């Protein structure tokens, strides 16, 4: 039976005294000046964390003092948290081009200007830019026509579908944008980093083409407003008859569009700052125009504007060629013909030959804007689709028709339909009016808090614009006559912009406002598209585009601007706003589709890095948005959709063709094997990206003689970490030879597989037979996994009762395991008290998972609670993070920085900074160190039986008590675990305690105690204390039955005749014990009731003579805690703030 005795020293009645100056002097001695001490660590440095960038001087300062001496060997690769937090919390991403600008200034030798930190908030940085990009040319030039053709009901459905598509995309985009810091690069960065370079490049180029064609659309809108509504006389090409007007207009659009494009490209080339300066002016024009529309709607309810339209029968007449809506007019007492008569008749005389329809039908004049109170909404409720060349007619008007087949003279002043219209065409034309939702994410580098601003600003902007569009559909249908709505260019209202006729106070507000807004939108497109192409080019994923990554010294994309202008010219040569709009709809819809796909894939995969701060998303919403985008692509134009998908597919294959390989197996299993082989070969190409890091576990378990797992809780914990979605290998080692123990290995594998299935652990099992345990574990660590699918984390249990083992190889194997994982750059998880860990059926209804973040080793400590809380066992546990502040640290600022850092990490946790100031090393620490070193000497230099070991250590402790009390009679308390275990017993036995109590307040024995106030003179004198010994029954029986000692008792006492003094202790061990004791006191105080405590695991010493001391340090560090997980990072595991 294993036994343990506890030596407890009760405080004296008098006041306690602190250690004398001599001991104090040694307690603060500089450890770097101690002779013969080796503090270089274990010789297996971990990989440097990507967050670490400290100088050697800083490293030297980080562990001055005693509080963190236990972790001083980690400082080369893992800095103290206090020295790291400020840089992480105050991370700022520079706007695109600022780095190149700084480099150019440095090359010129000029004085570098400080880069201003981003200061834009949600309103100015996201909301207003999104409004400016969403509201555009379609609202002013085409929405009234869409309502007139499709009717209020279908237009409402159209607007609702398109706005729903963008809203779902914005939700997905918000999830991606808040999944880490999004540097300058915006939507392309988000897509490419979420779906990989192939999809990212394909979708990025589609988004670039969409933005470029959007610039062409805005320029065409600008020219249409200029020539149709502002200065019609500026037209260069004029038609000889009505049938040639359309062709003349297209040529005018091409000429003026090319000129405007050249001017805009020049402005962008000269300096984007001018574009940004006028951005607010252009936005003000948009908002003012929209407010004018609503003001006009309100005014029309009680005072409609006067815009009469002329009808011949039920046919709408264009007002360009006449002024009086009548056939005849009275001049005095004489009846004369009007100009309208001359348009339909052969002469101005009453007996002239006139058009038959003109002769049979009357001319009437009605108000084009009856107003909101007119009840017109019922007439405009349903659709009136037209074919090309058809006259726009008013329903409900009496008309004397002509015989079927009678040709219509195109020279007559009717309002004709210029194109065949149908629902899907209108969707393609309208959809560009809801694009522009990426404007906020494109400015992510300029935002003060992108994770907060992008979701809030984008969703509010979409909600605002959607409300404006939906209300505009209803209000246009309620206020404007149907024939006017179907009149695309406002010919029936004297060539006025249709929406301008409704505006108040004047139609010119809308005309001028829409002109400047379309100019501004065109400039924004020509500014954003080249930068997007530059970002794609600099990624190097499309080799032939790399030339466009170069630019001016300040980072302006000169070559990319040139290519953008050339592509934009293609859209201008098309010259039709209605033809260009469906093209850019395809590219934007494809971009939005892949944004939704990225969010759905990330949500379903549940990778450890997927931690969006935006919570209101779901994979079903993303899938719905993706399906809606795909449907809208084919609704708008199925052939354009196929072309766009073909372009994206070709780009995808071009990017990945070097690594692509097709291989077909026979049957599903053959296909699976081929896919697995292909995936493993792809993984072999390079190490995984930081964002894709996840714990790939190698779980080391021990099996008993019946090949059953000794600690099944390890596999339960593995199952609870399955949110990491990584590889799991459960390994075990059997001692012996392969030929003799192969059957046992097979049984062990079957037993482990059954337990894995019961615990729902998805992974592989591997049992190794080796001549000794250390080599077997080393082989598992080195050879586990296949190709790129290898473990990066080792999970193992703490060696229970390591003090009680006859064979010291048990804890030596453990320390060698720590060294080998460090050498292999693997993370190590050590569970202490694993039998107390919960099984999968258990549930914690409350409690906390406490993280003690002492040194930064890559973020593994942060990741593990996040993964555990995804499991139902730990789901209701809150996460608390504690970090330690030293004397020179500002604990208040540390708490703020840590809170900011966790915000960037998208992790919700309570934060507390624990202050550990420099303090004198207590007598208890000296006593613990003394006994540790004495026991180490005994066990190393003498081979005693178990009973002798107990008796001699007890004797040494009693003899050294007087020396210790002379040095410091303060409150001392000593615990020694000296076990006894029956031979061959590998199972843990219940421990029984023997207490040796030194009662300083009890009266001493007269024969051995000095007189009052007298100090003991000889170190061999009996200590003036009353000693109580409590022995268990089993202990007594064992003491009676113990055999003769092979070593003389006198010889043992001669060996320890030297008296232990505090001065003779290794000061490095004292400082490390001081760290362990102080940290343990703080951790127990704060986290005694925690369901799980995670803390950094210090590395083992280089000098193997101190291995047992290392075990003792860890034991002291974690005592009095129920469930502990020691975490030692390898440097490759990183929990990143990036998306």
From Swiss-Prot:
GO molecular function: ammonium channel activity; chloride transmembrane transporter activity; metal ion binding; potassium:chloride symporter activity; protein kinase binding
Keyword Protein transport: no
Tissue expression pattern: Brain specific. Detected in neuronal cells.
Transmembrane domains' residue ranges: 99-120, 130-151, 175-203, 230-250, 251-276, 403-420, 430-453, 486-513, 535-555, 556-578, 593-615, 616-632
Disulfide pattern: 310-325, 345-354
Cytoplasmic face of the membrane: 1-98, 152-174, 421-429, 514-534, 579-592, 633-1139
Consequence the record notes for mutating residue 847 to D: In a colorectal cancer sample; somatic mutation
Post-translational modification Phosphothreonine, affected residues: 57, 929, 1030
Binding site for K(+): 113, 410, 446
Region (Scissor helix): 667-681
Record note on what altering residue 929 to A does: Decreased phosphorylation by WNK kinases, leading to increased potassium-chloride cotransport activity
Disease named in the record: Developmental and epileptic encephalopathy 34: A form of epileptic encephalopathy, a heterogeneous group of severe early-onset epilepsies characterized by refractory seizures, neurodevelopmental impairment, and poor prognosis. Development is normal prior to seizure onset, after which cognitive and motor delays become apparent. DEE34 is characterized by onset of refractory migrating focal seizures in infancy. Affected children show developmental regression and are severely impaired globally.
Record function comment: Mediates electroneutral potassium-chloride cotransport in mature neurons and is required for neuronal Cl(-) homeostasis. As major extruder of intracellular chloride, it establishes the low neuronal Cl(-) levels required for chloride influx after binding of GABA-A and glycine to their receptors, with subsequent hyperpolarization and neuronal inhibition. Involved in the regulation of dendritic spine formation and maturation.
Additional remark text: Inhibited by furosemide and bumetanide.
Record protein name field: Solute carrier family 12 member 5
Species for this entry: Homo sapiens (Human)
Gene it is expressed from: SLC12A5
